[in-house]
Curated annotation (Swiss-Prot):
This is Expansin-B1. Coiled coil: none annotated. Residues 58-169 form the Expansin-like EG45 domain. The gene is EXPB1. InterPro entries: Expan_Lol_pI, Expansin/allergen_DPBB_dom, Expansin_CBD, Expansin_CBD_sf, LolPI, RlpA-like_DPBB, RlpA-like_sf. Glycans are attached at N242. Disulfide bonds join C61-C90, C93-C164, C98-C104.
Length: 271
């Protein structure tokens, strides 16, 4: 699901007013959760799109065309609400494998959470379900059985969290369309390790103060202040284990909307 640029500032302003009016910043629902156990856990999986396709175009996390190119390409997956976490679970990586020994390989497939799916066939909110690209779903099969496994449609699987590893990539910040000196919205890309974000802060030029940004949807965060003065430093804190990273002056003073600015650092590619 893509939100039109004109809607994003409205969401950010609404959240800013809501939180300001409450007198305090409400705690993030999932921020204190630890990374799920690395043991294998049960779930179900389906697939969508073309048989050898990359799955969704865009998705509820807001990665847009990134999902159509490597390293995302064919590795994307929509996850049920229990893993999506209102968008805070965007970017998390999982290994998945199916159980039927007659068609399933022992090899696990790594996928990145880029979209939200329904809860699966049980329709229970706490049910864990993955809706994979056709290519990723087929890769769970033993050689020559990709078509057979896709014809099953629905599979019982095992899954576990795994560290995200974007080889040769550092964390990047995409400035969303519609951003101004009074409303700035950022999308986080290529986060190694846990992959998710629990909080995000920004620091203006010449300031020592870190200002909290608001989570608006998917992997998008925003700030309503003004006028904002770059260059901007950005501090990220992971959702699962509260690891922190600060990218100094990563967004230049002459920043423009729709541009992506890449840092020189990343989290360690471990959980």
């Amino acid at each position: 699901m893509q939100l039109f640029p004109v809607i994003l500032p409205t969401l950010c302003v609404f959240l800013h007013l809501l939180i300001s009016g409450s007198g305090s910043t409400p705690p993030l629902t999932h921020s204190n959760q630890q990374v799920a156990a690395t043991r294998w856990l049960p779930a179900t999986a389906t697939w969508y799109g073309s048989a050898e396709g990359d799955g969704s175009s865009g998705g509820a996390c807001g990665y847009g065309s990134l999902v159509d190119v490597k390293p995302f390409k064919a590795r994307v997956g929509a996850v049920s609400p229990i893993l999506f976490k209102g968008g805070e679970g965007c970017g998390a990586c999982y290994k998945v494998r199916c159980l039927d020994k007659t068609i399933c390989s022992k090899r696990a497939v790594t996928i990145i959470a880029t979209d939200q799916s329904p809860s699966g066939p049980s329709a229970k909110a706490k049910h864990t379900h993955f809706d994979l690209s056709g290519a990723a779903f087929g890769h769970m099969a033993i050689p020559g059985h990709n078509g057979v496994i896709r014809n099953r449609g629905l599979l019982n699987i095992l899954y576990r969290r795994t560290a995200c590893k974007y080889r040769g990539k550092n964390i990047a910040f995409h400035v969303n369309a519609g951003s101004t000196d009074y409303w700035l919205s950022l999308l986080i890309e290529y986060e190694d390790g846990e992959g998710d974000i629990g909080s995000m802060h920004i620091r203006q030029a010449g300031s020592k103060e870190w200002i909290s940004m608001k989570h608006i949807w998917g992997a998008n965060w925003c700030i309503v202040e003004g006028p904002l003065k770059g260059p901007f430093s950005v501090k990220l804190t992971t959702l699962s284990n509260n690891k922190t990273l600060s990218a100094t002056d990563v967004i230049p003073s002459n920043w423009v909307p729709k541009a992506t600015y890449t840092s020189r650092l990343n989290f360690s590619p471990v959980l």
